[in-house]
């Protein structure tokens, strides 16, 4: 799976995605409302990232045998396809089914770019995944396909067992073997990209912060300047006082963390499942575990993310698309998804199947996902990322105290939401 698509929820908020030119990616449809009947449908088109090709090819054969419907596969830039969905809906040139990161589902649905989706009993959703595909208006615009969460990677050549608490990490930082060359008193024992709000949210939320109220749906209730948020920011700052100056580089810290870990100079890091392949390629003897318990005894409540199957608004036959989505999220097809991609199924029965494979990364993601909070999928979330990044940088660099940085960020978020959304 391309790391670009897998980690989309981590980066979509830090940059504005430009509209990308993409070869038309779907079956041509007439510019008219979706037909509800499916008796005449003989072919469907599904558009996915290249990494899902093998998976779709296998389940497409099964679906053609079961339903008598041929599935045509088109691959390309999945994020680019979402960016130009508005234009494609207008032209009627859309695939019948495609995939979208959860944080795009609610906003695209609310903007009228996606059809409503019914969650079948066979989907075996849980509360978190259902929330991730439900917009603020209460309508469901996707069927959960994959779950993702940040986890902890640790170097088995440096530490025998996975650190269980942040106190364990603090003790590692006292070990002189992790001293950073060239900067006296600095350590790389544990590293986390905590000027990136996606990575830091679990620390803040574990202390009682939240982005929006009502499970991420109420943009008028912002909880990033409460006592919990300030406590989390101050704890992050205590680590930045131990870390090399380069960790404050909002653009380059991620590369620094990866390099230090791959070179055996860092014992533990927080990152996503999309980094596993790079560590394998670098021949790091790594383990994967849940993120350690916070100093307050609470769990690291990272954003729960992943991807869903969605149906564009302009599909010719909504019922036929819905039936194929139901097929894709059923347990057997979700098992195939795991076997072909090693991505964690959203379907809880298939998730148990994946956990039974005794893969460290799989087990860690599944366990960590239980402590996650849904990544808000409302359009107003776009107003959060940059102010939140600035909040973290200003505080950990010492340019502002945590309370001032948090209050300034919330003020800017509210102003931006008012300007963009009239609220």
UniProtKB/Swiss-Prot annotation:
Give the induction text.
By maltose.
Q: Which Pfam families match?
A: SBP_bac_8
Q: Which domain of life is it from?
A: Bacteria
Q: Which InterPro entries match?
A: Maltose/Cyclodextrin-bd (IPR006060), SBP (IPR006059), SBP_1_CS (IPR006061)
Q: Which GO terms describe its biological process?
A: maltodextrin transmembrane transport; maltose transport
Q: Which GO terms describe its molecular function?
A: carbohydrate transmembrane transporter activity; maltoheptaose binding; maltose binding
Q: Where is the signal peptide?
A: 1-24
Q: Lipid anchor (N-palmitoyl cysteine) at which residues? A: 25
The record's listing under CDD domains reads: PBP2_CMBP
Q: Which terms are listed as keywords in the entry? A: Cell membrane, Lipoprotein, Membrane, Palmitate, Signal, Sugar transport, Transport
**Per its UniProt record, what Gene3D superfamilies does this chain match?**
Periplasmic binding protein-like II (3.40.190.10)
Q: How does it sit in the membrane?
A: Lipid-anchor
Positions with an attached lipid (S-diacylglycerol cysteine) read 25
Per UniProt, substrate binds at 52, 77, 83, 103-104, 148, 193, 196, 251-254, 274, 307
GO CC, sorted alphabetically, is: ATP-binding cassette (ABC) transporter complex, substrate-binding subunit-containing
Q: Where does the record say this protein resides?
A: Cell membrane
The text of the family note is:
Belongs to the bacterial solute-binding protein 1 family.
Q: What does this protein do?
A: Part of an ABC transporter complex involved in the uptake of maltodextrins. Binds glycogen-derived linear maltooligosaccharides increasing in size from maltotriose to maltooctaose with the highest affinity for maltotriose. Has a very weak affinity for maltose. Has also a very low affinity for maltotetraitol, indicating that the binding is selective for maltooligosaccharides with an intact reducing end.
This protein is called what? Maltooligosaccharide ABC transporter solute-binding lipoprotein
Q: Which organism is it from?
A: Streptococcus pneumoniae (strain ATCC BAA-255 / R6)
State which gene encodes it. Answer: malX
């Amino acid at each position: 799976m391309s790391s670009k698509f897998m980690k989309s929820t981590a980066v979509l908020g830090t940059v504005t995605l430009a509209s990308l030119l993409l070869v038309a990616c779907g079956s041509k449809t007439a510019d008219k409302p979706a037909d509800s009947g499916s008796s005449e449908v003989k072919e469907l088109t599904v558009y996915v990232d290249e990494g899902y090709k093998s998976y779709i090819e296998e389940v497409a054969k099964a679906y053609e045998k079961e339903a008598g419907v041929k599935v045509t596969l088109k691959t390309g830039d999945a994020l680019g396809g979402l960016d130009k969905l508005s234009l494609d809906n207008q032209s009627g040139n859309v695939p019948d089914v495609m995939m979208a990161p959860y944080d795009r589902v609610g906003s695209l649905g609310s903007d009228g770019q996606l059809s409503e989706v019914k969650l079948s009993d066979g989907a075996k959703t849980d509360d978190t995944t259902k929330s991730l595909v439900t917009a603020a208006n209460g309508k469901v615009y996707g069927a959960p396909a994959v779950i993702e969460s940040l986890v902890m990677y640790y170097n088995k050549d440096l530490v025998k067992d996975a650190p269980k608490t942040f106190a364990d990490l603090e003790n590692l930082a006292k070990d002189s073997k992790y001293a950073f060359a060239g900067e006296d008193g600095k350590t790389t024992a544990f590293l986390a990209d905590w000027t990136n709000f996606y990575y830091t949210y679990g620390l803040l939320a574990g202390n009682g912060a939240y982005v929006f109220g009502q499970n991420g749906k109420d943009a008028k209730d912002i909880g990033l300047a409460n006592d919990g948020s300030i406590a989390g920011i101050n704890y992050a700052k205590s680590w930045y006082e131990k870390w090399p100056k380069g960790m404050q580089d909002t653009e380059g810290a991620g590369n620094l963390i990866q390099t230090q870990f791959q070179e055996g100079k860092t014992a533990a890091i927080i990152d996503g499942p999309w980094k596993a392949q790079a560590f394998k390629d670098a021949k790091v003897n790594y383990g994967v575990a849940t993120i350690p318990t916070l100093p307050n005894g609470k769990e690291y409540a990272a954003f729960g993310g992943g991807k869903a199957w969605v149906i564009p608004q302009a599909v010719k036959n909504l019922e036929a698309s819905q039936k194929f989505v139901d097929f894709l999220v059923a347990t057997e097809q979700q098992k195939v998804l795991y076997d072909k991609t090693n991505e964690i199924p959203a379907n809880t029965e298939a998730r148990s199947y994946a956990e039974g494979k005794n893969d460290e990364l799989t087990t860690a993601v599944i366990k960590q996902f239980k402590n996650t909070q849904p990544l808000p999928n409302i359009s107003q979330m776009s107003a959060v990322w940059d102010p939140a990044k600035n909040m973290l940088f200003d505080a950990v660099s010492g340019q502002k105290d945590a309370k001032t940085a948090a209050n300034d960020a919330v003020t800017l978020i509210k102003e931006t939401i008012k300007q963009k959304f009239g609220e």
